[in-house]
């Protein structure tokens, strides 16, 4: 969107614009949606989520039903739940935990990696096999999922959990910042 070649380009032909693969900051989404609007697009960016273990995408923002910060709702026949990290205990709506996915596209396991398979695929009390994604998230009472970040990316400092993506969102909101990356330093 910063490239001069995009000045004056008519994007009214667009039918969809999608984002996945990592979190999209609220500020960047706002900037990109404004860019689309200013270039005659009738669409906004729709966020999605998925993992290799469930054959890519498994969640997407419904058309004209975006909720700020959400990656959308699970696809039909795909189930999401949030569990307390390191357990299979389901968290209540609005509580942060590990994103777990179950459904017909979930893998059978990693080839010749039984230990990794056992850590990732777990049978819960409901009898279903769930992919433990290693991602932190929240689900609201309407089934919208909010990706926070990879569990391994969390920084623990002075006994506090610090989420780099939250700090990056704040920094990225500044007009003079194009993009930021927060890392922990021992």
Regions found by a protein language model. Give the residues of each.
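Acidic-histidine catalytic/liganding microenvironments
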Residues: 3, 114, 174-175
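Gly/Ser/Thr-rich phosphate-binding loop
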Residues: 2-70, 79
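Active-site glycine-centered loops adjacent to acidic/histidine catalytic or metal-binding residues
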Residues: 21, 50, 72, 103, ...
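Short Gly/Pro-enriched turn/cap motifs at secondary-structure boundaries
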Residues: 69-75, 120-121, 127-129
């Amino acid at each position: 969107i910063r490239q001069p070649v995009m000045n004056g380009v008519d994007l009214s032909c667009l039918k969809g614009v999608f984002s996945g693969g990592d979190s999209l900051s609220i500020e960047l989404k706002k900037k990109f949606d404004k860019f689309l609007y200013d270039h005659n697009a009738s669409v906004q960016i729709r966020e999605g989520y998925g993992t290799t273990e469930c054959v890519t995408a498994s969640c997407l923002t419904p058309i004209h039903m975006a909720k700020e910060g959400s990656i959308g709702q699970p696809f039909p026949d795909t189930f999401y739940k949030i569990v307390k990290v390191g357990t299979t205990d389901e968290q209540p709506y609005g509580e942060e935990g590990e994103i777990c996915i179950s459904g017909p596209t979930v893998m059978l396991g990693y080839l010749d990696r039984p230990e990794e398979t056992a850590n990732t695929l777990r049978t819960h009390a409901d009898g279903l096999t769930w992919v433990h994604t290693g991602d932190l998230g929240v689900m609201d009472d309407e089934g919208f999922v909010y990706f926070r970040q990879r569990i391994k990316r969390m920084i623990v400092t002075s006994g506090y959990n610090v989420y780099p993506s939250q700090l990056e969102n704040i920094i990225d909101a500044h007009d003079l910042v194009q993009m930021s990356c927060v890392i922990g330093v021992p």
